[in-house]
Amino acid sequence: VIKCNSKDDWKKYSVTFTADEELESDGSGLIVTNTGDSDLDVDMVSLMPEDTYKGHGLRKDLMEQLEAMHPKFLRFPGGCAVEGQTMDTAWNWKDTIGDVSERKEMINIWNPSATEPYMMTYGLGFYEYFQMCEDLGMEPVPILNCGIACQVRSGSATDEEHLVPMDKLQPYIDDALDLIEFANGTDESNEWVQKRIQMGHKEPFNMKYIGIGNEQYGDIYFERYEEFAKQIHEKYPDINLVTTSGTASSGSSNDLAWNWANEHEELADRMDEHYYETADWFRQHAYRYDNYRRDTNTKVFLGEYASKGNAWYNALSEAAFMTGLERNADVVRMASYAPMFAKYGNTQWSAADMIWFNNSDYVLTPNYYVQSLFSNNQGNYSLPTEVKLNGIEKDDALKGGVAVGSWGTHNEFKDI
């Protein structure tokens, strides 16, 4: 029981309690009731365990599974949430720092329903992500909005609801510059350095990478990216910038991105590729990067990838594919499986996830073990190998069929 005596202003109340009995993993919740005669306004409620990973608020059991992988970097806060359904609902990192109770909530792109929306409290914000990276020995790789909402959902994104005009882009570039100060700055007169210190971290986080955009593509994207890159490189030349090739493993947007990078390699250190494909696709594309350009500054960052499933065959196909990533380490400098976590009963994404969890337990998928094996067993050299199979004949015959057709016209085919 908490006795509230605040009349005209907000007041924070904290209490520690222990449940009388073991709670159901997903069938329990916290209910706040008012037993008094007056009205009670509740602005923000947070329920947290006392024992968290290194005392920084994250579940110890889940973080320990990441720790066992010895991960090298974390790309956050993820994908389409950064973009937003519209620019008004895009992720703004400045809303995610400071006192948790004062952070501005935002609707999440994955369920923007007007009647039952999924809201983000930003309880896990950019400061917590930086702290998580430090606790796990990972490089932070934050992704920022580039002035374009999700193009998959908005199509051409030509109106101001989805596309920031070039003459109004500067505040978004300033957000990127301010983030670098928040993460790396040492001048204690700087507003964003002060905010980091006030949150309890005087020393800089030493961030080395920033991604501009998530899965943006086309000329409207690169026109905006170039403005970000020029200003960031001018002020912070040591920051590695990540550009993006869109939403697919191949096609026009991917081709356009690499053509742009070949002409502007000084503006992009990494090209972020994303693809989710079948297990067979991954097995068949283990040689994907064998023929990528090696004489360019812009290297591959495979920022999101997974085969569509958590079965053993999916994991084995990913492992086969990852041998190609290792073999081409001079081309593919970074790779990150996605998504990393999914809560049972609370996700619209079921194609694949690395770790499933509920309120009390977790399940490590075969995909997790493949990622862990590769992460914990990295070598310095890739040795050429040759496999000879005795008694097995190689069938080089072409298989398949040929079809001809037309659309909306009359045709005659002869001598086929």
What spans do the regions from the language model cover?
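Catalytic-core region of carbohydrate-active enzymes that cleave or remodel glycosidic bonds
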Residues: 131-132, 230-241, 259-377
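Surface beta-strand/loop "capping" patches
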Residues: 380-394
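N-terminal catalytic cores of secreted or lumenal carbohydrate-active enzymes
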Residues: 1-235, 239, 243-266
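Extracellular/lumenal ectodomain signal focusing on beta-strand-rich modules
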Residues: 44, 209, 270, 304, ...
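Structural detector of coil-to-beta-strand junctions
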Residues: 29, 354, 401-403
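Short, solvent-exposed loop/turn elements at domain surfaces
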Residues: 82-85, 281, 412
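Extracellular glycan-recognition regions
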Residues: 392-416
